[in-house]
């Protein structure tokens, strides 16, 4: 597509304020709401686990944003947390879900701070705890963190998960269990907010 073929531009995300040539700027929150509601009009709660932040968004029956909460101050509960855990566990990020699902028990990871959680994981591994059990604990800790956030806006089914975190089956399972509602994954969840 050449510049002459572009009729209208919309920017979103963290960099939206830095691009000056757009016709319109829309927040990530609104984009997630529009994208999810377009594909599933029964969606009422969106959980977005992205690389930099995690969001929980409550939708009205018309798809409007009723409330939201966002964790953008630290990496806890985000895709970055998953990346750090995968690195410490010496596991490719794409295999972290499978490793966690092989866990026979969920080893508690009590630190919400990524830096401290990393140290806690290293301690568990040094004590002989299996990688799979530690991975299960890391996934469970994210689900617990997100459930706490969701409690602040209220969870109403249908729950839809977006962002790259939605590609982690173990996280989807843990979150479904923690929220007490099935979590639905729509096509291309990692680009839903675009």
Please tell me what each predicted stretch does.
Residues 14-50, 55-62, 147, 151:
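Conserved phosphate-binding catalytic cores of ATP/NTP-utilizing and phosphoryl-transfer enzymes
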Residues 1-29, 173-184:
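N-terminal glycine/serine-rich phosphate-binding loop of ATP-dependent small-molecule kinases
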Residues 14-15, 150, 155-178, 186-192:
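Glycine-rich phosphate-binding loops at beta-strand->alpha-helix junctions
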Residues 24-33, 47-51, 69-77, 136-139, ...:
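Active-site nucleophile and cofactor-binding loops and adjacent substrate-binding regions
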Residues 1-7, 146-157:
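Phosphate/pyrophosphate-binding loops at sites that engage ATP/ADP/AMP, CoA/4′-phosphopantetheine
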Residues 62-105, 190:
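Glycine-rich phosphate-binding loop plus the immediately following alpha-helix
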Residues 117-150, 189-192:
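Adenine-nucleotide phosphate-binding core of ATP-dependent small-molecule kinases
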């Amino acid at each position: 597509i050449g510049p002459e073929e572009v009729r209208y531009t919309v920017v979103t995300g963290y960099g939206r304020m830095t691009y000056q040539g757009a016709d319109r700027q829309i927040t990530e929150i609104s984009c997630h709401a529009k994208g999810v509601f377009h594909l599933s009009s029964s969606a009422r709660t969106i959980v977005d686990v992205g690389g930099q932040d995690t969001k929980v968004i409550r939708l009205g029956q018309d798809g409007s944003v009723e409330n939201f909460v966002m964790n953008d101050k630290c990496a806890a509960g985000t895709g970055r947390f998953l990346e750090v855990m995968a690195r410490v566990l010496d596991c490719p990020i794409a295999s972290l879900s499978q490793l966690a699902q092989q866990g026979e028990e969920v080893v508690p990871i009590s630190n919400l701070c990524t830096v401290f959680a990393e140290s806690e994981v290293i301690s568990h591994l040094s004590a002989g705890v299996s990688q799979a059990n530690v991975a299960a604990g890391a996934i469970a800790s994210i689900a617990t963190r997100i459930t706490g956030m969701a409690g602040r806006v209220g969870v109403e089914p249908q729950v839809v998960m977006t962002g790259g975190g939605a590609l982690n089956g173990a996280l989807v399972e843990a979150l479904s269990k923690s929220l007490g509602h099935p979590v639905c994954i729509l096509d291309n969840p990692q680009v839903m907010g675009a």
